[in-house]
Amino acid sequence: EEVQETVNLKYEYSVYR
């Protein structure tokens, strides 16, 4: 799902930061 991918990206970005 595109929505889930976006959430995953945001979560990964937050963890990376």
From Swiss-Prot:
Top-level taxon of the source organism: Eukaryota
The protein's name: Unknown protein 2
